[in-house]
A protein has these predicted regions:
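Short pre-active-site segment immediately N-terminal to redox-active cysteine/selenocysteine motifs
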Residues: 69-71, 75-79, 144
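N-terminal targeting signals for export/organelle localization
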Residues: 1-52, 173, 189
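Structural microenvironment flanking redox-active thiols in thiol-disulfide oxidoreductases
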Residues: 84-122, 132-139, 176
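Thiol/disulfide oxidoreductase modules built on the thioredoxin-like
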Residues: 117-125, 131-182
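A generic structural signal for alpha->beta connector loops
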Residues: 69, 100, 125-126
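Hydrophobic beta-strand anchors of alpha/beta hydrolase catalytic cores
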Residues: 72-73, 103, 148
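A short beta-strand-turn-helix
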Residues: 48-71
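Extracytoplasmic
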Residues: 44-46, 67-68, 98, 143
Length: 189
């Protein structure tokens, strides 16, 4: 009987952790907004930050970068299986939107040399930022990864997507969001 209770307790704890760490894709969408895009009036200001590029050591100032083009911030880690599965899709999108949308990986768990090595081994060419203090990840509410945050040129968070669903086409869904954002920004004087 004691053994059964212990086994049941272990299973419950394992299930709780599985629920906590299993990434379920979700996107916060306002009524009437384009798919995956929070309406501009309902969008919150993005948390400003400065992080070092893991490859060059140069600082990236988020607000200054966002003024140049919309940003996709991908919070990830090398040990995260769903993150690793999502990164090739983000690489393809970074090439598709080159010059129109800037993509940045934000890594909170690896050293810059490990981030550089991982990027090189996996053919990732978009900049990877080092957030070893977890300050930026926490300020964006990254309680699970991967977490994608789309920031418009006004510095507002327009889309937040948590997790990775291998059955969902990331490239298609994020493309729809980015296309809607770019179309909206073309209309704005």
């Amino acid at each position: 009987m004691n053994r059964t209770k212990t086994l049941l307790a272990i299973l419950l704890v394992a299930a709780a952790f599985a629920l906590l760490f299993t990434s379920v894709r979700s996107s916060k969408i306002a009524d009437g907004a384009a798919p995956g895009l929070v309406a501009a009036g309902a969008a919150k200001d993005a948390v400003d930050f400065t992080l070092a590029d893991a490859a060059t050591g140069r600082p990236l100032h988020m607000k200054a970068a966002a003024r140049q083009s919309p940003l996709v911030l991908d919070f990830w880690a090398t040990w995260c299986g769903p993150c690793r599965a999502e990164l090739p899709h983000l690489q393809a999108l970074s090439q598709k939107y080159q010059g129109r949308v800037a993509f940045y990986g934000v890594n909170s768990s690896d050293t810059p040399p490990n981030i550089r090595a991982f990027s090189k081994e996996n053919g990732l060419t978009f900049p990877m930022l080092s957030d070893t203090q977890h300050s930026v990840a926490f300020s964006y509410g990254a309680d699970s990864i991967p977490l994608l945050v789309v920031v418009d040129t006004e510095g507002r968070v327009r889309s937040v997507v948590s997790g990775y669903d291998p059955d969902e086409n990331v490239e298609t869904s994020l493309s729809r969001t980015l296309d809607a954002l770019l179309a909206e920004q073309r209309k704005t004087p």
